[in-house]
Amino acid sequence: MAELRLGYKASAEQFAPRELVELGVAAEAHGMDSATVSDHFQPWRHQGGHASFSLSWMTAVGERTNRILLGTSVLTPTFRYNPAVIGQAFATMGCLYPNRVFLGVGTGEALNEVATGYQGAWPEFKERFARLRESVRLMRELWRGDRVDFDGDYYQLKGASIYDVPEGGVPIYIAAGGPEVAKYAGRAGEGFVCTSGKGEELYTEKLIPAVLEGAAVAGRDADDIDKMIEIKMSYDPDPEQALSNIRFWAPLSLAAEQKHSIDDPIEMEKVADALPIEQVAKRWIVVSDPDEAVARVGQYVTWGLNHLVFHAPGHNQRRFLELFEKDLAPRLRRLG
């Protein structure tokens, strides 16, 4: 099995830019192996929300750290961005921070793309997935060097070159919520990304088998694929604090169809805040006992995931990092 890694999710929707950078730096100081960041033009909620630019955060944290792996979880390189420009940006970061950068990609959400000018009805999954695959092909062709002509269904290049590229390009991690994209991740991604709290059968019967199938079709060793999961966990020795911390992140407990189709953070906030706290908690591991926390997290390792990235919902992130380093990290490391 691939190496066990522990990571920190920097919540760009919750914290202002300077604080978000300081948290990324603190993640390395507290022993995390990676720090990932979301890429939102608009946050999940209007009141108290933030949405700093992910690539600015990565470079700022990269300059102040030495070893931690940095990446997006995730970015959509297909609508408000031109994938060639994203390829250039990540190639530059790959040169600045060798072997420390990855590009995590997904198919996109209306919340971020409609406000920035996407015209017409929000595309169905089939088109969004096709755009994603094409953008990955385009970026990799650019990273191979030489001049590139590319005539795709959605994107075109004419004599394009990226002049500063790290050897081998940049690892691409592909986010999947279902088996079709998971199979693609196994076939074409250096990494695979999913999120926690969706029921054992999704991971054991759909996602992980699909990743393995995709790897087999491509003749790849599945152990070479970094299998990342964002674990939504509210850990605090105070049970009431652990529960209250999750309220800010109620939008994550909405159905996938709602999250993908709502394009206004004010509406998103209104719909999410109508959810009872008990329903919000179903998406989270809400715990006060470290052994219980590790037992519930450990099931994901048993199911085949090796890179555990922790999304803590509370406003006091330094407290979480301190508690994680003291109470959870030593226990979790033993799982590997």
From Swiss-Prot:
Active site: 40, 109
Pfam families documented for this protein: Bac_luciferase
Gene3D superfamilies per record: Luciferase-like domain (3.20.20.30)
Catalytic activity: oxidized coenzyme F420-(gamma-L-Glu)(n) + D-glucose 6-phosphate + H(+) = 6-phospho-D-glucono-1,5-lactone + reduced coenzyme F420-(gamma-L-Glu)(n)
Record-listed E.C. numbers: 1.1.98.2
Root EC class: oxidoreductase
Function per UniProt: Catalyzes the coenzyme F420-dependent oxidation of glucose 6-phosphate (G6P) to 6-phosphogluconolactone. Appears to have a role in resistance to oxidative stress, via its consumption of G6P that serves as a source of reducing power to combat oxidative stress in mycobacteria.
Annotated PANTHER family: 5,10-METHYLENETETRAHYDROMETHANOPTERIN REDUCTASE, PTHR43244
Protein name, UniProt field: F420-dependent glucose-6-phosphate dehydrogenase
Organism: Mycobacterium leprae (strain Br4923)
Organism lineage string: Bacteria, Bacillati, Actinomycetota, Actinomycetes, Mycobacteriales
Chain's gene name: fgd
